[in-house]
Amino acid sequence: MSFIGEFKAFAMRGNVVDLAVGVIIGGAFGKIVSSMVDDLIMPIVSIFMGDKGFKDKFFVFGNQTFESLAKAKEAGVPVFAYGNFIQTVIDFTILAFVIFLMVKGMNNLKKKEEAAAPAPVPAEPTKEEQLLTEIRDLLKK
């Protein structure tokens, strides 16, 4: 088989295609969750924090003060931008929780489908098994 033929066989296997679809859908889903966090959850958090949330929280190393993280970075001052890290952790936690709920729901549906499926009918014994059963019964007598 040629190199291109091997690659085509590899790329068209079910697992690779499923993985590609999963990555694409996962990227789109990540954007949805990020929007949910940025546009719906963080405004509520900012009500209690009194500002725009965590993203712009930072600590400047030194005696200077800056009104925003962008201005501190522009000045080239070393900063400890802990707010962006906290925001990323919140995004990840919400994304992981939503995915967990989706997987849990899918597993529950799968269990219900398996429970609702009729039990398989036992197969008829083969002629060989019937003959062996008859021989066993004759030997017992």
From Swiss-Prot:
<dbReference type="InterPro" id="IPR019823">
    <property type="entry name" value="Mechanosensitive_channel_CS"/>
</dbReference>
<feature type="transmembrane region" description="Helical">
    <location>
        <begin position="16"/>
        <end position="36"/>
    </location>
</feature>
<comment type="subunit">
    <text>Homopentamer.</text>
</comment>
<keyword id="KW-0406">Ion transport</keyword>
<protein>
    <recommendedName>
        <fullName>Large-conductance mechanosensitive channel</fullName>
    </recommendedName>
</protein>
<keyword id="KW-1133">Transmembrane helix</keyword>
<dbReference type="GO" id="GO:0008381">
    <property type="term" value="F:mechanosensitive monoatomic ion channel activity"/>
</dbReference>
<keyword id="KW-1003">Cell membrane</keyword>
<comment type="similarity">
    <text>Belongs to the MscL family.</text>
</comment>
<dbReference type="GO" id="GO:0005886">
    <property type="term" value="C:plasma membrane"/>
</dbReference>
<feature type="transmembrane region" description="Helical">
    <location>
        <begin position="83"/>
        <end position="103"/>
    </location>
</feature>
<keyword id="KW-0813">Transport</keyword>
<dbReference type="InterPro" id="IPR036019">
    <property type="entry name" value="MscL_channel"/>
</dbReference>
<dbReference type="InterPro" id="IPR037673">
    <property type="entry name" value="MSC/AndL"/>
</dbReference>
<dbReference type="InterPro" id="IPR001185">
    <property type="entry name" value="MS_channel"/>
</dbReference>
<keyword id="KW-0407">Ion channel</keyword>
<keyword id="KW-0812">Transmembrane</keyword>
<keyword id="KW-0472">Membrane</keyword>
<keyword id="KW-0997">Cell inner membrane</keyword>
<comment type="function">
    <text>Channel that opens in response to stretch forces in the membrane lipid bilayer. May participate in the regulation of osmotic pressure changes within the cell.</text>
</comment>
<dbReference type="Pfam" id="PF01741">
    <property type="entry name" value="MscL"/>
</dbReference>
